[in-house]
């Protein structure tokens, strides 16, 4: 199982300040604990500011076919928004980010592991369940799982022709992140102080 926990309110409002926001709630699968009441309370506060263009609540956004069908019904409201705020596990955020290529997609939750069955997703996206989601700084691409070295402070310098030096069949995660940030006009995120990975949140050391 895994648990999604809301990021600090200050962290979320710093993302939404001055922006029109479309909100996506994923109630998850049975393997995910979603903070539904806390999320609803925060979203009510955001909506009171008059900047929420719409809210979509569904499940299994990690399934691309299901997610695409749901999003199409809300596309006009999504296009009005400057930012799409996703309340889900890290896999769900990455799925939405891949589909909405021209939009800034941000995670409202951190994901933590709980011993036991981890659920099934039909996608290649991976969430390390690190409890300190980096997706808001990296354009919706997880540096922990997209980089074979799990670097969080940028490219190692060993990639060649866009491929990882550890696995020549693997695309460099940080080159993917750079391209994604450039596409959405967020290269400034690379200038943010590095969010040092706290390994004490990892399942292996608990």
Describe the role of every protein-language-model region.
Residues 1-62, 71-84, 97-137, 141-206:
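Iron-sulfur (Fe-S) cluster-binding modules
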Residues 86-90:
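N-terminal glycine-rich "phosphate-gripper" loop used for MgATP/nucleotide binding
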């Amino acid at each position: 199982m895994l648990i999604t926990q809301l990021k600090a309110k200050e962290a979320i409002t710093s993302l939404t300040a001055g922006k029109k926001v479309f909100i996506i709630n994923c109630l998850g699968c049975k393997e995910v604990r979603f903070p539904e009441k806390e999320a609803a309370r925060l979203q009510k506060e955001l909506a009171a500011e008059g900047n929420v263009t719409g809210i979509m609540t569904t499940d299994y956004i990690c399934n691309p076919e299901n997610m695409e069908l749901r999003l199409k019904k809300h596309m006009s409201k999504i296009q009005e928004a400057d930012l799409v705020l996703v309340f889900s596990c890290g896999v769900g955020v990455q799925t939405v980010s891949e589909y909405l290529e021209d939009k800034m997609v941000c995670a409202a939750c951190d994901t933590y592991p709980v011993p036991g069955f981890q659920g099934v997703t039909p996608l290649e996206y991976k969430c390390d369940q690190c409890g300190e989601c980096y997706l808001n700084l990296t354009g919706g691409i997880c540096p922990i799982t997209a980089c074979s070295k799990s670097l969080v402070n940028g490219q190692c310098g060993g990639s060649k022709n866009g491929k990882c030096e550890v696995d020549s069949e693997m695309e460099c995660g940080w080159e993917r992140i750079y391209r994604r940030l450039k596409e959405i006009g967020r290269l400034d995120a690379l200038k943010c102080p590095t969010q040092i990975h706290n390994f004490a949140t990892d399942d292996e050391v608990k």
